[in-house]
Amino acid sequence: MLLAQRIWNWCRRFRYRCGYGVHSPSDFFLITSVVYEDLPYYAYERLKMSSPSKSLPHYREKVNKLLFRLVNYFRPMSLIEVGEGNGDAFRYISNARTSMISVSLKGLEKIETLHRLEMELKRLEKVDFLHIAFTPYYKEVFELAFPYLHDESCVVVGGIYTSEERKTWW
């Protein structure tokens, strides 16, 4: 059943897979040159060789590479990752731009995470790239970080379809 659903979703999205039907030049460029880019980047091999994590298989290498390309494209000065990615996601993100301030908040209880997030947000004053990985308190994280986002900020939320509640929130 899962295979049939995946094939159906692929068929539905086939027309738009390379940006066809997208009328915004900037969105078309993002789709064709960042999302569907398949050429090797300068750091892929080095990152792949250095201790790949297998702790969370749902965060595959292709997702890590997409996060790398997004950071490489948007060139943020500050990045916050909240939640359990797989460890590799943060390595890929932080290696895409080594001069940015990178903060990872994971493996903490809800109150401690939100408190540390609030302290980091006040310290940074604005967030250019926010990665909300797999965390049960994604709503609180987004609401807390929202005032620190600006027009040029990029927000990546992982696991949107993991629950009906999360899908509705998105």
How would you name each of these model-derived features?
Residues M1-F129, T135-V156, I160-W170:
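A short alpha-helical cap/connector motif
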